[in-house]
From Swiss-Prot:
GO terms for molecular function: phosphoglycerate mutase activity. The active site is at residues 9, 87. PANTHER family: PHOSPHOGLYCERATE MUTASE. This is 2,3-bisphosphoglycerate-dependent phosphoglycerate mutase.
Amino acid sequence: MIKLVLIRHGQSLWNLENRFTGWTDVDLSEKGLSEAREAGAILKKNGYTFDVAYTSVLKRAIRTLWIVLHEMDLAWVPVHKCWKLNERHYGALQGLNKDETAQKYGEEQVHIWRRSIDVRPPALTEDDPRYEMNDPRYKALKKGEFPLTECLVDTEKRVLAYWHSEIAPKLKNGNKVIISSHGNTIRSLVKYLDNLSSDGVVSLNIPTSIPLVYELDENLRPIRHYYLSMDGEVPEGEIPKHITF
C-alpha cells in the first residue's frame, strides 16, 4: 500500500486579513507558524517519514513544509519546488478584501468566482504592479504559460501535469511523499484522486495545516483517505477544528 500526505499551508497573513491571495507571496501568520509546528508533531507522533517532498514557489507553502520537516527531524529530505503547485491565480482580485469585494460586486458573483470550477475572475493586466511575470522565480515560463487569472479547471490542468510527470512516478517507485501546497491546488488533486463531480468539488474545503493521508493501491487509486490528529485518524465525517478557508 502506498501512502501520500497532502497538507495545506498554515494560516497566512492574508488569510488572517480575509484577502484574496493567489500568487501573491504572503508569509505565514503567527497562528500559521503554530499550525505548521503542530502538523509536524502530528506526523511524527503517528510514525510517518518521507523520502521526498514537493511544494510550490510561494513562501507560505515552503515555510510550512520546512517547519513540518524540522519538527519531524527530516530536514535532510529533498524538496522540489514548482510553480505548477502554486495556488490558483485570482487575477485582479488578488490583494482585495473578500467582504469588500462582495459588497462591490455582490455576494453571488464573488461566490461564483471563488467556488465555480470554470469561471475566471477578472484578469490582471500586464501593466498592473501585481503582475508577477518578471519575478525571477518564473523566468522559465513562456509568456503564454503565465496566467493573468485562473479558474479551478486551469489550476487542475497544471497541477495534474506535474502530478503525472513528477509525483506519480515517485510514488510508484515506493517513495514516501508529502506535498505542501494550497487550498485550490489540493482541491484539484482530491478531485482527481476521488473522481469528484463538479458539484462535489464546489463544496470541498481543505483545512489549513492538518495532514490529509491518502492510502493508494499500486495504480495510485485511492483505497481510503483521512485527516490525522495527535490521537491518530480523525473519524470519518468529523471536520478538524482549526480551519481557514
